[in-house]
């Protein structure tokens, strides 16, 4: 009886190795598709998996073929429209499948739809936040923030061909072949000794000699059938993410909820902050987040109230900056904490309050924070708050500002603000 043993450790994901290779090969196209898909999601559905589509021509394999130009002679079967020696005009286009869908219908042409496949939540978030980091992160005395880095972690029985360990695989192959053939080799050695004795004995024992030769041949065949290398022998270099202790950090999220912020603008601000929250919680451990909502008055709130409260009012931006300054002095010593802030507003502010915002940031907040980002969400012309902040940007290296006009700008602006910097952090 023949037994088939499934040694694959992937279980239901039997093509995991091929899947990982595919994700690496077409990472650029997948990231482009993800950046387009993130803007189409609802606010509460940012961290689930995603159906990714890639143009078919991007995944086509290179091949040699004749060019489409030049003069060709071909033989086609005749029909009621063409007869011998007729010349057929070359087609002038008319592909289908990946077209825009605009224009007149045609009876000619063919094409291929885009290749669509599903990626998991983890794969989606890994690609979404790749190459992002908190800027100017400083090593402080108390260490609680944990960043995960990839390290070698021995060997594993499954992996991608690029990580295969030839030496360890051959060692396993030798051990397996030795274990599977040791008993047969001892038996073979004993039979060969008996055959030598019988062959030299008198009188000759032909039947016994023939039986021994047959058993020896069968044993040798069994030994030779043991494969030199088996999938069970293969070992791959294993890598795992290990916590890398770093400095503790706090992120202040300041959101304008005044009456000038319509629902569409608030939704874009929420999308930005949800991306920020997912990035912090997935990339770092023990990062504290302080949520501040403001109109004419500022208030520190919890996560649920920050995203879903319907409270609104007038606009005094300095109230949020004053509250942040109070919280920093009360709970977050700059010598022990890396302090970050992200402020989102439509730029509409009481005119006399904008210079006060400039003063609070310049004298109190920017000297103690590692990085302060301001996002203005509006399609109107910039007002006094933006102009005051432009002076800060030219003076302070740890201040950045970006403009969001519609949903398509959210993810590119987010990556621009938090892209990983090669330069060393300042002290």
UniProtKB/Swiss-Prot annotation:
Q: Where is this region: Disordered?
A: 87-110
- Give residue spans, biased composition: Gly residues: 92-102
Q: Please give the InterPro entries that the UniProt record associates with this protein.
A: UPF0229
- The parts of the chain that form a coiled coil are none
Q: Which Pfam families match?
A: DUF444
For this chain, the family text in UniProt reads: Belongs to the UPF0229 family.
Name recorded for this polypeptide: UPF0229 protein YeaH
The organism named in the record is Escherichia coli O6:K15:H31 (strain 536 / UPEC)
